[in-house]
Amino acid sequence: MSKSIVAVVGRPNVGKSTLFNALAGDRISIVKDTPGVTRDRIYADITWLDKQFTLVDTGGIEPESKDMMLTYMREQAEIAIATADVIMFVVDVRQGLLDADNKVADMLRRSGKPVILVVNKVDNFDKFMPDVYEFYNLGIGDPVPVSAASMLGFGDLLDLVVGHFPPEALEEEEDERPRIAIVGKPNVGKSSIINKLLGENRVIVSDVAGTTRDAIDTAVTWNKKDYVFIDTAGLRRKSKIKEELERFSIIRTVSAVERADVVVVVIDANEGVTEQDAKIAGIAHERGKGIIIAVNKWDAIEKDDKTIYKYTNRIREILSFLPYAEIMFLSAKTGQRVTKLFDSIEVVIQNRNLRISTGVLNEIMMEATALQQPPSDKGKRLRLYYITQVAVKPPTFVIFVNDKELMHYSYTRYIENKIREAFGFSGTSLKFFIRERKEND
């Protein structure tokens, strides 16, 4: 099952960022050494009572005037409603109940989504509890007093959050059909690609009922194989603020990627790979998804016999953390190579499910260590005892060594490259865990 998504909504200066950062702590979902991965703390993966969820901060841009305030908050509420399973609505006990709070509460109430009313800045419960009671007037349940700055009340808050998640026994049965998310920054042609795919005569299309988000998922059959395409549109109305639009685009991407097996990252051929493209690709990479880079609007590019080669090299250079990603060039406008996307998706799915026997893996590892000696430090040399595959989707391996401190990242990458040379694994990341064991174990 994918992790539930919890969105944080509220006016500027009510302490959303403080609450988000305090809850996220060091568990923020960011790979610091990965180029192009977002570092603006929009989302974090959190575990509480053995339940994992993704916390999303919908804030970030402060309105320039009071007139913009309600529009800004409505957009926050819309993105939360479109993507979240549970919504944290944060208000400020010291400012009291404002008209904007009432209007957003109305939107959240009508959505039918679980809403937790978080009354922040309650540093002294005895002093502020009478003021907390005022927020009952919002009509969205019991207010939960917390102090983000002092981390007071977090246990009760998180208990309520995970209490809204469905019990495991009641969760949807695992759908065996591969789930495909087509993501990308605004205006790269995501909808055009989906519409072109779904408009093909050979494609059988139906809506998927009972999904956990408002977005409509679409069941697709192609060449007698079933897929589910995730609708990443979410917030249909565009924001007037560029930075806000980008932030909401990333939030929608997190929501879609969480549920996907394969992520198609759409890039505009006219623009090349932008910083936001890299951020979006990084989200999929962090979460170990299958990845296809689809360069759209290829019909608009003047070409010679080296154009694809140059474009591919440039993409590999900028997205250096995705050497395994499939790359394809297409045009939603003309339909050029659009249905070839199914072929790439199928390749990635097969590679994500590929299992390699322990015997074969150890032969590869022994050959690799013979070609390039493992590193050493202060006279102690790394010894690799054996390797085994423990999971798929993505393929996951455990390497047993004498001292995991000696297993540098570069040598793990070397072993990964040797495995890829033998089996390809195109389109999927590989995960490696290093474990120590004594020589006589």
Swiss-Prot record:
Residue positions annotated to bind GTP 2 are: 184-191, 231-235, 296-299
Which InterPro entries does this chain map to? Answer: AAA+_ATPase, G_ENGA, GTP-bd, GTPase_Der, KH_dom-like, KH_dom-like_a/b, P-loop_NTPase, Small_GTP-bd
Q: Which Pfam families match?
A: KH_dom-like (PF14714), MMR_HSR1 (PF01926)
Where does the EngA-type G domain lie?
Answer: 4-169, 178-353
Q: Where is the KH-like domain?
A: 354-438
Q: Could you name the domain of life of the organism this protein comes from?
A: Bacteria
Q: What is this protein's function?
A: GTPase that plays an essential role in the late steps of ribosome biogenesis.
Assembly with partners or alone: Associates with the 50S ribosomal subunit.
What name has this protein been given in UniProt? GTPase Der
List the top taxonomic levels of the source: Bacteria, Bacillati, Bacillota, Clostridia, Lachnospirales
